[in-house]
């Protein structure tokens, strides 16, 4: 088995020379301004080692990766009642598609497409004002990442609100079916702000530890969330975490993962490591092009695929 340090360093060195980097997201103006020639990677292992490469300490907008953290909190808050309002199946459609909602009476296919994440944000509002729900999300992210400096980028949140017409349509459509139970602007306010959380690869890899270690931040540490909840979230990351590219990611990488259009991916090697990669150029499905390549190479070199014999 090769040394993890060497594998990570080699991947970062090779991808620094890549000529094909995908395209940055342009429908959110603030994301369109991010320089494409960046790549970062961080791995936190079961023994507590942190391995960094490239732009691992550069903060970026985590976007849909935030859906992992809000799902964790919503399940803790309302439990399995959440699954009466959002499904657990891959969608096969674009992450912001409205088509499926019409056929399925306003219930989104899973909590990682935009419509599903808006339902999760709405669930976070049960008994709370939007500011309180956002405070709970930010506190949890800071806690699992062990870094109080993590913040919400208000400029990105404003940019999303000003251009989020498709998400507004999704929310209003679900509200018409009674799937959303709070004012649309409240649910969207939480959603836009959670997506604007700014983190680095180092932050993200640390934050994902509870998913890698059965609900704990270290294999022998105290439980942060129930092990069953962590396992179920990881299962959804494997089947639904990369939009309509989820099957391809599972085929090539074989790890639970959640991507965001900011170019980040959080991936989990159960019992072994939490991994974060970032490169802002996206493939046609909205997933980081170089990030996916990096994770494929890492999983293959370390035999970390959940399907490895």
From Swiss-Prot:
Enzyme nomenclature, EC number: 3.5.1.2
Reactions catalysed according to its record: L-glutamine + H2O = L-glutamate + NH4(+)
Alphabetically ordered keywords of this record: Hydrolase
Chain residues that bind substrate: 64, 114, 160, 167, 191, 243, 261
MF GO annotations: glutaminase activity
Any Pfam family matching the protein: Glutaminase
Biological processes per GO annotation: glutamate biosynthetic process; glutamine catabolic process
Subunit structure, as described in the record: Homotetramer.
PANTHER family: GLUTAMINASE (PTHR12544:SF29)
Identification of the protein by name: Glutaminase
Biological classification of the source: Bacteria, Pseudomonadati, Pseudomonadota, Alphaproteobacteria, Hyphomicrobiales
